[in-house]
Each structure stands twice: as C-alpha cells, then as structure tokens.
Regions:
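Short, well-structured N-terminal submotif of metal-dependent ribonuclease cores
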Residues: 1-38
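Short beta-strands and strand-loop turn motifs
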Residues: 6, 80-83, 112
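Alpha-helix capping/helix-boundary segments
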Residues: 10-11, 42, 115-116
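Short, flexible loop segments at the rims of nucleotide/cofactor-binding pockets, characterized by
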Residues: 12-15, 59, 84-91
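Residues that scaffold the ATP/ADP-binding catalytic core of kinase and kinase-like folds
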Residues: 13-15, 49, 58, 119-120
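Residues at secondary-structure transition points
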Residues: 20, 37, 64, 89, ...
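PIN-domain endoribonuclease scaffold, especially VapC-family toxins
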Residues: 27-85
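Acidic, PIN/NYN-like endoribonuclease modules and their adjacent C-terminal/linker elements
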Residues: 89-92, 96-99, 103-110, 114-136
Length: 136
C-alpha cells in the first residue's frame, strides 16, 4: 500500500465539506486501506485553518467542531518527523512541507493547489504520484 500525504484542502474536503469526490479516499482511510502520513506542522496548519471564519461557519452549519475534524486527523494520520527539504521547491511556502514529506517517503500526494499541481512532472521524477486514483 502506497503511503499518501494529504494537504489541508484535501483534509477539509474529507471532513468539513464532505466533497463527494473525496468519498473513495475517506472510505479507504476509514477502512485502513490507505496509509496517511503527516507531521505535527500539518496538524497545526489544519487547526489554524479550522478557525478561519468561513470554515467555522461551515463547521457550525454541519454541526461539527474543530475538535471533531482534528480527531479524524489524529485517528487516521500517522505522524512522522518533519522531512528534509525536497530537491524541488514550491512557490507557495505553506505547501512545501507536504511536498517534502511525500518525496521523503515516495508517497502519493493529494492536493488541489495550483502551485503544487504545476510541479507534477518534477514530483514524478522524485517518485511522487500527484492525485493518483485509489487503490495505489
């Protein structure tokens, strides 16, 4: 089973926005059929984003709390030490930690961020598949 790194927007799609396109990944995580790698800074970013007013409104509308979403993170993500800098640098510094971890572990990277998507070929040279279908 190929490990996967999920950026914050993907995590929001999974457990805040309940995006139908994320249903296969959510099911795979819940069934233990997908191996999600993350770091403490990724969890910290998620906690910070969950406090944004537009995200908090969405949580309230769905009768969710930030703690519930962070609980999904804690239950399904396997924490890893921070990864060393990958050979390719993202223009969006906030996304670099996801790239670094994916490169270090040869993990699939799930992201919708344009600055990450434009790196698809470079990441492939490092053994990172960008947004691969399930299963992998």
């Amino acid at each position: 089973m190929t490990p996967r790194v999920l950026d914050t927007n993907i995590v929001l799609d999974l457990w805040v926005f309940d995006d139908p396109a994320s249903a296969p990944l959510r099911s795979a995580l819940q069934e233990g059929a997908a191996h999600w790698l993350a770091t403490s800074p990724m969890r910290e970013e998620l906690a910070r984003v969950l406090d944004y007013p537009h995200i908090a409104r969405r949580l309230n509308a769905r009768a969710l709390t930030a703690e519930t979403v962070l609980g999904h993170f804690d239950r399904h993500a396997q924490l890893q030490p921070d990864a060393p800098r990958a050979p390719y640098v993202c223009k969006d510094a906030d996304d670099q930690k996801f790239i670094d971890l994916a490169v270090q572990h040869g993990a699939a990277l799930h992201s919708k961020d344009a600055q990450v998507l434009c790196m698809k070929n470079r990441l492939a040279r490092c053994g990172v598949a960008l947004n691969p279908p399930l299963p992998l």
